[in-house]
Amino acid sequence: MAASSAKKWWKNAIIYQIYPRTFCDSNGDNIGDIPGIISKLHYLKELGVDVIALGPIFPSPRRDSGYDTSDFKAIDPDLGTMEDLDRLISRAKRVGIKVMMDMCIASTSDEHEWFKKALEGDEKYKNYYYISAYKRNNWHGLRSRSAWNKAENGQWYLSIMGKNQPDLNWSNPDVYEDMADAMRFWLDKGIAGFRLDTMNIIYKNSMADGGFNIFVKGGEHYLYTQGCRDIIKRLNQDVWSKYKCFVIGEGTSIFPDDSKHFCEDGLDAIFFCGRIDSGSKKVQKLQARRNNKKLIKLVDKGQHTLETPINYVESGDSTTYAKYFGNDKQNCLNFSKVYTGMHLALVGIPFINDGEYCRDPKVEDDPTSLYSFTSKMIEFRKNSKALSEGVYHRVAAPYDVLIFTREAKEERLYIYCNFTPAPRQVEFYGDRIVFSTYDIGSLEPFFLKPYEFRIIASNI
């Protein structure tokens, strides 16, 4: 793994995802920036955050939210300077917070200097990409009917993620060395690790036509290839293990079984995000009912399959579930607490997505806010051996209620999650209620309240 078993500092970390452009604006230009993040370090520390995960900070034309990178060794001038980043890393370190960053390694922007030189005919950089006088196969793009796009000079280039994101040719040793060098550049500055975006499509094992594929035509030639696994292993050996950094993989159409293989190859953890489908207002109730069942199934599978799941906690204003509530802000808040509590109680690393509620200074003083709930739950998790070290077991429950235990040494906790707006009759275990989204004195003996998250402790 990227960090040796004795040095896995990230095992019990609380990670907070920040999208710099929308987090905090320090200079009044309506664009969040790195100095703005520095100004909020006290807030992040009080929340209980151990690691900041920065969204894209590289220069980019922003045709894909900044993941279309035009320089892997520079800072987007809208977000600040290299000195600002150095200051963020230094000041975060003072308060016990590490900084990691997103890095899209499958492609570049079509405005990257490498790609410009490639189209100009520079043979070295032409081999950094898949450039041809014609479409070499019938592959579909992940967002288009064809993975091939035509440049102004009449040449075709492979761009699976989109027209403006030409794929890098990782079978070229020069590409490997330049990308490994870019990682070393940031690690030498004190970056604690990376979230590698679209890492599972970096290696193409063939340029042959694609047949039927459950995800996308041609996917059998670039999704989860052995070559991709070999590159991950090599990056771990050459770079990550030497810095004891934390590396998370992210990619399209990743499921728990695939995640397990990538972690065996050198990643420390991988995003397994079971996304919830949205629907029209007419089917929202049906969708919500179906999705609660789906969510519980996905969570349970991830807990059994992955050694270190990433428990992605979407904010109350960004989660797809919020669509079901419309203007019903109270129920949206109540559900968000259950959803957040569940993720903070599961085995794995909580990855909290920045949301509007976290940028409002009023929420820090509101005991009913999601901020307050999250802060208390993080503190509870950090002080509980069962939640920080314990094993997971699911307990039988109604289809839209999740009950599971976390157990370590002399402590067993029963965690109850009611994802519905109605009371649910369940069998309660344990000796004493230690945490709830409701006032403990108001709880009923045989029912979970609507959208209730509850923890009951039991001495073993």
Question: Where would I find each of the regions flagged by the language model?
Answer:
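Residues immediately flanking
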Residues: P20, M103, T198, G251, ...
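Active-site regions of oxyanion-processing enzymes, predominantly non-cytosolic
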Residues: W186-L196
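Short glycine-biased active-site loop of nucleotidyltransferases that positions the nucleotide triphosphate
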Residues: R62-G66, S259-C263, T405-R406, F446
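Carbohydrate-interacting/catalytic domains
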Residues: M1-A53, P59, D86, R91-A92, ...
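Conserved alpha/beta catalytic core and glycan-binding cleft of carbohydrate-active enzymes
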Residues: G96, D110-L142, I232, N236-Y357, ...
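Acidic/aromatic-lined carbohydrate-recognition and catalytic surfaces
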Residues: A2-R184, D188, I201-S259
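Active-site rim elements
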Residues: P166-N172, Y176, E220-Y222, Y321-N334, ...
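Secondary-structure capping and boundary motifs in well-ordered enzyme cores
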Residues: K11, G227, T305, C332-S336, ...
